[in-house]
């Protein structure tokens, strides 16, 4: 009389495991596409000295805060010392866009930190066409970050870069804090990078 119950429990356990594996398999994360531009003549100025991190146009919204914090951590890792604007030798301007990527590759805004192009190299950062790298399934949430580093005194652009990736909406990396660290870490990997080069950084 006890065997059918045991068999039912085993069947339920197998079904539960299968459903869990299915949920894991449906989580998709693309590589981070990174493009960077720099003035070779000023390469020596990068990765040292004091820097102030801000949103484009002084934007200081709560939505932008985790991205600014992630950028500040990466800048410290590559050699900068974060300081107040008045004492900074360089300024890092951060722009972030979050979007939903449909199966046809079209973007629908989720939320926007600061819009528009941020640099002066004619790169039009943030205006690229999104490509859905995942298979079938639900929508994907994309995060795009652009950062420009300028001389504080002259406003001259020393470096600019963009990082963009997508994750299925059920992935932990679709959350704001996790996506902030993901794009920032990729953007500043092997900093400052090569002028005009686009690379893909795998997400661990």
Sequence positions of predicted segments:
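Solvent-exposed loop/turn segments at secondary-structure junctions
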Residues: 58-59, 98-101, 165-166
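Structured segments of extracytoplasmic/periplasmic soluble domains
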Residues: 70-81, 99, 186-194
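Bacterial N-terminal signal peptides
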Residues: 11-22
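Surface-exposed short loop/turn segments
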Residues: 95-156
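Envelope-exposed proteins and targeting segments
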Residues: 47-49, 71, 78, 88-92, ...
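Acidic helix-start/capping segments at beta-turn-to-alpha-helix junctions
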Residues: 83-102, 203-204
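C-terminal/domain-edge helix-coil "capping" segments
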Residues: 25-43, 136-204
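A structural "domain/chain start" motif
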Residues: 2-3, 7, 22-78, 197-204
